[in-house]
Each structure stands twice: as C-alpha cells, then as structure tokens.
Amino acid sequence: MTSKLEQLRAITTVVADTGDIEAVARLKPVDCTTNPTIVLKALGTPAFADAVKEAVAWGRKQGGQSDAVVAAVADRLAISVGAALAGLVPGRVSTEVDADLSFDTQASITKARHIIASYKERGIERERILIKLASTWEGIKAAEVLQSEGIDCNLTLLFSQAQAIACAEAKAFLISPFVGRILDWYKKSTGETYTAETDPGVVSVRSIYNYYKANGIGTVVMGASFRNVGEIEALAGCDRLTISPALLEELDKDNGKLERKLSPDNVKAEALQSLDEKAFRWAMNEDAMATEKLSEGIRLFAKDLVTLREMVRKELTAAAA
C-alpha cells in the first residue's frame, strides 16, 4: 500500500508549512506557506546566505540603517524566501503582511500591494502568491478590497466560526483555521486529554468546512498548525492542509490505510449567516479561546518580525564597519 502521505495527496492538496528548501524539494508539496517565524528560521540556513548578503548590500545603497531601510531590507529577505520556494512548487506561496499592521486596514492593503509588486520585479506573478493577513476585522476588510483587485488572500490566525463567516463574506480566497493552537488552549484550560476525534481544533475545522460546503462558499479551507499526525488524518479530505516537514515525513513513512473524513458530498444543511462589525466583535469577545489565541498569535509574529529587523540592523552595521 502507498504511504499515508500519498493517500492524502489523492484527496487533499498538501501544502508545506516551511521555508526549508531541501525539505520542499524532497517532499514536493503543491504550495508553501511562510510566516515571520519561518522566514527568520530559513534565513539562518546556508541556503539563504547569498540572499542575506544581497539584501544587505541593497540596503547599504539605500542609505544605511534608518528604520525605513531596515524594514525594507527585511521585506526584501521575506520576498527572497518566498521567491526561492516559488521556484520549487507548482502552486502558490503565502507571504505575510507585517503583524504590526493587523489592526490597520489601509496599511495592510498598501503593504500587500507592495509585496505583489516586489514579487513581480522577480518575475513572479500575483497568481502564484497568497497574501497572508491576520483574521482581525481590519485584516478581513483589507482582504475584501484586495480580492476585488485580483490579489488573492490567505486569512490566517483563524480560531472561530465568526472569523470564518466574516472571511467568507469578504470572499477571501483561502482561510487557515489553526488546529494545534486551539488544542493547546483547551488542554491548558481544562487539563483534559483529547483523541483526534474530540480534539477541539479538529472539531472547529470540521464545523467550518461543513458551513462552507453546505452554503456553496468558494473560499478554500486549509487546516494549519498541527501538533500530531492524528489531527491531520482526522481532517483527510479537507480542501488543503499545510503541514510541517516533520509531520509530512511521518506520514510518508506510514503505509497504513488513510480514511477520508471530509467530503463536500457529505455535509449537513446549515443556514448562511452574516456578521457586521458589531456582531463580529461581540462574537469574538464571547469566545475567550479565539480572542486569546488571535492576540497571542499576532504578538508572536510581531516579535519575530522585530527579531528579523534586529538581525538586519546588525548586518547593516557590520557591513558599514
């Protein structure tokens, strides 16, 4: 029998959640997702040593070490990672808008347009890129504008049905509901252990998937943030799943039978809902898990963005010495 990874590929688009060039070349995912954490990790590998040198040299020509130049070099490096990944996968690469813009709709739109233009300068068209935005109200509204301009978006840090409903109304190309981080919250909050079937993260994604398919919503559901292969197997059949190299390797080594768990042909009828800003914010306020994990996720990505910029500043300083 073929591996569980190959069986999964037959029913779900497999995406690699990594900037590891060697892993992507070896595991052959359709798409890749990145975030500030992944970009930072990738830039510490030999594969991107030349990209770092090039970006620093470019930064020196822009006039040194101002905050604006440092931010521009950091952007250039994130695009370098994305461009390298785009050369290895046939599909899309997700690149994230700065986490510190998560509550600024217009700034997020401006940054997204800049990312798309930066990729185009490297010969990579917008059809190959997904703009990642946090699923705040402001991020979702930014996605609505960008989608109307033909810029496809990946709404990330999604932890609730309310976020999923708002993303659908914005006609987002894709959402990334987080599985493992939801599990983390419930384990810490309740002290309980969960099976793959009772895993609150799995239950959340299944609920969102059912709502979308029952209402003919075209937004792609891509489960993310997995803690174990059990969660992945429990979502087999989901539109897409973005998976770390370690878990992809584990699936590749397992030749057991993989059972399909999700199918658009097997959903329960569910009423279509609509949320204005007040209703969205109230729903989030009532969901402690979603509120806490969204805020935490933004803080963590913002922290890694600061770390990336600090690295850039040090490199620029060293180059000037």
Swiss-Prot record:
A Gene Ontology cellular-component term: cytosol
Active-site residues, Swiss-Prot/TrEMBL: 132 (schiff-base intermediate with substrate)
Entry annotated with the keyword Translocase: no
Complex and partners: Homodimer.
Lineage: Bacteria, Pseudomonadati, Pseudomonadota, Alphaproteobacteria, Hyphomicrobiales
Disulfides per UniProt: none
Keyword Amino-acid biosynthesis: no
Name listed for the protein in its UniProt record: Transaldolase
GN (gene name): tal
Cellular localization per UniProt: Cytoplasm
The protein's annotated pathway: Carbohydrate degradation; pentose phosphate pathway; D-glyceraldehyde 3-phosphate and beta-D-fructose 6-phosphate from D-ribose 5-phosphate and D-xylulose 5-phosphate (non-oxidative stage): step 2/3
Job description of the protein: Transaldolase is important for the balance of metabolites in the pentose-phosphate pathway.
Keywords: Cytoplasm, Pentose shunt, Schiff base, Transferase
PANTHER family per UniProt: TRANSALDOLASE (PTHR10683:SF18)
Transmembrane segments: none
Organism: Agrobacterium fabrum (strain C58 / ATCC 33970) (Agrobacterium tumefaciens (strain C58))
CDD domains linked: Transaldolase_TalAB
GO MF annotation terms: transaldolase activity
GO biological process terms on file: carbohydrate metabolic process; pentose-phosphate shunt
Chemical reaction(s) catalysed: D-sedoheptulose 7-phosphate + D-glyceraldehyde 3-phosphate = D-erythrose 4-phosphate + beta-D-fructose 6-phosphate
Similarity remark: Belongs to the transaldolase family. Type 1 subfamily.
EC code(s) of this entry: 2.2.1.2
Top EC group: transferase
